[in-house]
Amino acid sequence: MCILTLVERKHLKNMVHVRLLVMMHILIIYSTFGAVRRPINIRVLEGNSCDTPQVIGGKCMNISLCDPAFVHSIAYQEHTPVCQQNAFYRVICCQPFLDFCENSKQFQIMHGIEAEPGMFPHLARLGLKSEEDGIAWTCSANIISERFLLTAAHCNPVNIAGLGCAESMQCDQQNTVKSFISNPKYKTSFKYHDIALVELEQNIRFNKRVLPICPYISKTDLHESEDLVIAGWGATESHFQSPRLMFATVRTVLQNDCKDHYASLLKASPNKKLHQGITDEMYCAQGALVDNVTEYIDACSGDSGGPLQTKQNNNLYLIGVISTGFGCGSSSPGLYTRVASYFGWIKETVSATRDN
C-alpha cells in the first residue's frame, strides 16, 4: 500500500492542475482553428498560388489583403493553412481583397504609349448613356471586385460602365451603374477626398481581359527611382480623346517635396479647390520631360478615376486614383487620391453592401 506524504499529495494535485490547463488550451486552439490540413510546403512565398479544400486557385497573401467576408468565414477559421508567417507578418492562402487579385503581364495621357490588348484588365470606362446620344465615355475606373469599381468622386454622374475595352467604342462587357458612392468627406467645390466606389447592377464576368486589381495598402511613398504606370483613354497631345488605351511611366514625388512645390505655386496662383495645399491623402507623381518639347509625361482630363499603379510580386497594385493637377504636362506633379488612406472605408462599404 502506497502512502503519500502531505507534500507529495500537494505536488500531485498541482501536476493534475497543470495537465488540465494544458488540455484546456489544446481544446480551445482546436475548437477555434479546427484540424488544419498542412500543405506540402508550409513556407510558400507571398504571391505564389495555393490551394486548400475551401480555396481553389487562391494566392498566398498578407492577411490584410484577403477578402473580409472570407476572413470572417468558417472556411477561413477552420481550414486555412498558413503560407508564411512570423511574429509581425502573416501570409495565408485566401481569396485576396476584394475577391482575388490579378496576376498581370477625364485626365489624358500626355506622350504615352499605346497599350496592348489585355495589358490592364482591371481598367474600366465610365460614361453617360442616353437614347439620343448613345454613350459618352467621361472617366476611367478600376475593377476591385466582381461588383465594385474604384474611381474619382468628381466623375459623377455616370450610369454605365465598360469593361475589357481595348478601343474607344469597343468593350467586351457593359454594365449598368447601380449606385455611385462618393467618400463622405468629398465636396464638389474642392479637390480633396476625390475617391468613390461604383456599384454595378450585375456581377462582372472575369476572364483574361477583365480582372480586378489589388489595392496598395502601405501609406509610405514608394522610392523615387521606382517606375509607376498611369493608363487611360483621355486626350493625347494630338487628339481630344485617344481612340485607344494609352499608358505612360511616372515616378513618385516625395510628399514633402510635393507640398513645398504646391505651396509656392498656390501662393503665386491661389486656387480655392486646393486651399489646404497638399494633404497626406494625396499621392504625387510626375513623368519625365519629353525631348524637344516643354511638356512632361502626365495625365489630363479624360483619364480621371484611372490607376496609378506599381508591379510587385508579379501583381499590379493600385496606389492611387487619377484626380487632378495644375495643367496637362506641366512642371507640377500630378495629384492622385492615395488608396491606402481610404482602405478602411473601401472595405467597410463593400462589406456592408454584401451583407444587405
UniProtKB/Swiss-Prot annotation:
Disruption phenotype: RNAi-mediated knockdown causes a loss in phenoloxidase (PO) activity and a reduction in microbe melanization in response to E.coli infection. RNAi-mediated knockdown in the susceptible strain G3 infected with P.berghei, does not affect the number of oocysts and ookinete melanization; however, severely reduces ookinete melanization caused by CTL4 RNAi-mediated knockdown.
Marked site (Cleavage) residue numbers: Q108, I109
Disulfide bridge partners, by residue number: C50-C93, C60-C83, C66-C94, C139-C155, C258-C284, C300-C328
Pfam families with a match to the protein in the record: Trypsin
Broad EC category: hydrolase
Glycan attachment sites: N62, N292
Posttranslational modification: Secreted as a full-length protein. Following bacterium E.coli infection, proteolytically cleaved into two chains, p12 and p30, which remain covalently linked.
Superkingdom, taxonomy of origin: Eukaryota
MF terms (GO), sorted A to Z: serine-type endopeptidase activity
Domain Peptidase S1: 109-351
UniProt-annotated location(s): Secreted
Active site: H154, D194, S304
Keyword entries, A-Z: Disulfide bond, Glycoprotein, Hydrolase, Immunity, Innate immunity, Protease, Secreted, Serine protease, Signal, Zymogen
PROSITE patterns membership: CLIP (PS51888), TRYPSIN_DOM (PS50240), TRYPSIN_HIS (PS00134), TRYPSIN_SER (PS00135)
One cellular component term from this protein's GO annotations in UniProt: extracellular space
Domain Clip, residue spans: 49-94
Main location: secreted
Protein EC: 3.4.21.-
Gene3D superfamilies: Trypsin-like serine proteases
An example Gene Ontology biological process: positive regulation of melanization defense response
Subunit structure: In the active form, heterodimer of a p12 subunit and a p30 subunit; disulfide-linked.
Role of this protein: Probable serine protease which plays an essential role in the innate immune response against bacteria and protozoa infection by activating the melanization cascade. In the susceptible strain G3, appears to be dispensable for ookinete elimination which occurs by lysis.
Domain notes per entry: The clip domain consists of 35-55 residues which are 'knitted' together usually by 3 conserved disulfide bonds forming a clip-like compact structure.
Annotated family: Belongs to the peptidase S1 family. CLIP subfamily.
Protein name: CLIP domain-containing serine protease C9
Species annotation: Anopheles gambiae
